[in-house]
Structure formats: C-alpha cells, structure tokens
Curated annotation (Swiss-Prot):
InterPro entries linked to this entry: MATE_fam (IPR002528), MATE_MdtK (IPR050222), MdtK-like (IPR048279), Multidrug-R_MdtK (IPR022913)
Claim: Transmembrane helix is one of the keywords in the record: yes
GO molecular-function term, one example from the UniProt record: xenobiotic transmembrane transporter activity
Lineage of the species this protein comes from: Bacteria, Pseudomonadati, Pseudomonadota, Gammaproteobacteria, Enterobacterales
Membrane topology annotation: Multi-pass membrane protein
Protein's name according to its UniProt entry: Multidrug resistance protein MdtK
Amino acid sequence: MQKYISEARLLLALAIPVILAQIAQTAMGFVDTVMAGGYSATDMAAVAIGTSIWLPAILFGHGLLLALTPVIAQLNGSGRRERIAHQVRQGFWLAGFVSVLIMLVLWNAGYIIRSMENIDPALAEKAVGYLRALLWGAPGYLFFQVARNQCEGLAKTKPGMVMGFIGLLVNIPVNYIFIYGHFGMPELGGVGCGVATAAVYWVMFLAMVSYIKRARSMRDIRNEKGTAKPDPAVMKRLIQLGLPIALALFFEVTLFAVVALLVSPLGIVDVAGHQIALNFSSLMFVLPMSLAAAVTIRVGYRLGQGSTLDAQTAARTGLMVGVCMATLTAIFTVSLREQIALLYNDNPEVVTLAAHLMLLAAVYQISDSIQVIGSGILRGYKDTRSIFYITFTAYWVLGLPSGYILALTDLVVEPMGPAGFWIGFIIGLTSAAIMMMLRMRFLQRMPSAIILQRASR
C-alpha cells in the first residue's frame, strides 16, 4: 500500500503544474473571446470561427510532438541522457516541417469559411484575417511544445506552468494594444487577437529556451555535441509514435465539432444548453488529462529503469487517483449543476436543459477519466497505434452513430435532441475506457523482456 501512496504523491506533484498550465491556456482563449467581444459582436464571432479551424490543425501538430515525452522519459530512466539532445533536435525539425504544413492549411482556410452557409461577408473577412495573423504563431507554439516536452520527459512540469502564466500575462496587454490600436499600432479588432496570440506563443517559446539554457539539471543535455541536421531514422520513429496520437486528438476534436453542427438546427435553446454542458465538462476534463501526462512520464521512466513492475504500479496508481478525482467532480457536477448553468445563462429553458445534460456529463466523467489516463499509460509503453484504433472505433463507430440515432431519429425511441448525443458520448467514452484497459492488461501480461524491448525502440 505504501508504494501506491508514494507513487500517488509523485504523480500529483507532476500533474498539478500541468493542470495549472492548462488553466492558463484556457484562460488565454477566454481573454481573447471577452476582449474581442468588447470590441464588437462580429469580431467575437470571427475569433470563434477562426478558433474552430485553428484548434484541429494545431492540435494535430501538438499530438505528433507528444511522442517526445515518453521517448525522453525512457532515455532518462535508462541513464542514456546523452541521447536526449539528439531526440529534441529532431523534435524541432519535425515541428518546423509540420508548422509549414499547418500554416499553408490555415492560409487557405478562407475557402472553408466563405463556403459556410449564409455567413456574413464582413464576418468571413474578419475570420480569415484572424487566422492569417494567428498562423504566424504556429511555429512558436510547436517549438514551445518541443521544449516543454523535453522538460516534462525529464519530470519537470513546473516550467510549462510558469511559461503558461507568463503567456497569459503578456496576452492581455498585447491584445489591448492590437485590438484597439494603442502605442502607434493599428486598430485591428478581432484580427488583433490573432496577432497578439501569435506573438505570445513566440514569447513563451523564447522564455522556455532561456530557462533550459540556465537550468543546471539540463546542462549535460544542453552541452551535447553533434550534428543538428535532420535524422530521417529518428524523425520516422517520432512520426510513427506521434501520428496515432495526433490522429486520435484530431478525431476527438472533430467529433465534438460535428455534434455541434448536428445540434445547431435544433434551435437556440438546445444549442445553448449543449454548449454550456460541453464547456463545463471540458473544464473538468483538464484534471484527468493532466494526470495522464504525469502517468506517461512515470511509466516511461520506470520502463527506462528496466522495472516493469514499477511501471505497473505507476499505471494502477494513476487509474486509482483518476477515478477518485472523477468521482469527486461527478458529485460536484450533480450537486451544483443548476447553479453552474446559471453562471453561463439566466434563461430558464436553457438552464433546465444544461442542468439535465450535466447529469449525463457526470455519468461519463469516470469513463472519460479511465480512457484518457489509459491513453497516457499506453503512451508510456510507446503503444500509440492502439490509441488511434481505440479512439476511432469508440468515437466514430460506436459513439457518434448511436448518438445520432438517439438524438435525431425514431429508430429506437422518440428523438431525444441533445441528450441523445450525450448518451452517445457515454457509449463512446465507456467503450474507449474498456478497450484501453483491455489493451493495458494485454501489454502488462507480456514477458518483461518483450515489454522492455518495445519500450526501448
């Protein structure tokens, strides 16, 4: 029992800074929305439309680079720190190549925006302008993620938290300058949010690089000599590990976007209630997601040390802590669902629907916690391909079709509206949790030699 308590302390010490970093990131998006809304409703809508295209694109790159964390954790645990610098350098090359592709996609996103049904031309132009300003931040964001993954792979999660809050503090005044046109800068409105956010990502990257250069604990990595040219073999391996994660993230983000589109014809009350419940459940999701990042680090480190039993302990502890957290957040959600809905909107119909949907959100929080921490465990074992297959099957083969049938057809019951999609979420997330656990048990029952061989690839 003592080993689980000790492991839980280590996991929480790693996870809490990640939680705070994620809160800072979420707050940046909130600040952009509020400040753009303060300028005009059109500008706020433009930022919202632009963000809906930016997020899937940049999260694809983010997911691809998540492969670095278990690689570095495993090298650190095995005492092969001399190989870390080369992996990080290849991570920067990969981030550079991917950012060029993302920038090309975002530059041409105007075709998508202008093809939207009945979109106001002025709104479309502002959304395109916002994206074309924001896309210059894509390299800065991805380079920052490489540096952050280096630190987190070495079990140092506090730098990412600090840089997140630096970014938030810089974002507010820079937004003010470019939205309203102060200190000689042009008045750009919502487009100014894109300029500010792009600048903030570069500031966060440069601040993280400055920290790494000064950190004594990384001196041996920083001083590593060798070529900085692209290494096709290393980059291929990072892509093999990262691409399934990137696709899984992409499918998850697009799932919720598709559901939002399917809910939109049902009316303002249904859309508002759905959005409130989704926004709140996304905030609660920060907890298991951060714990999953910590579990990846611990499992990778233990496998690097050659201890499959300690890796199992880290995995089981992460799941136990995650279920406890999810139980508490579910109780909190059920108990205060109406008060929470009132924070977003005071329309009685919207509040009633949102409170009902939050009951369903509370049901799936435990499944959601298990599946996301399970994904973190599999990343630690470098078994990322299964994450993609599980996510695709659970969300797109089971969750979305069942939600669609329940919400919009009478094949099973009378059309349930948004609640049908939320039952679909429960089906999808529960299926993902079950499949993640089955895959984890399959891996852990392998002979130790095979587990360690797979982890050292």
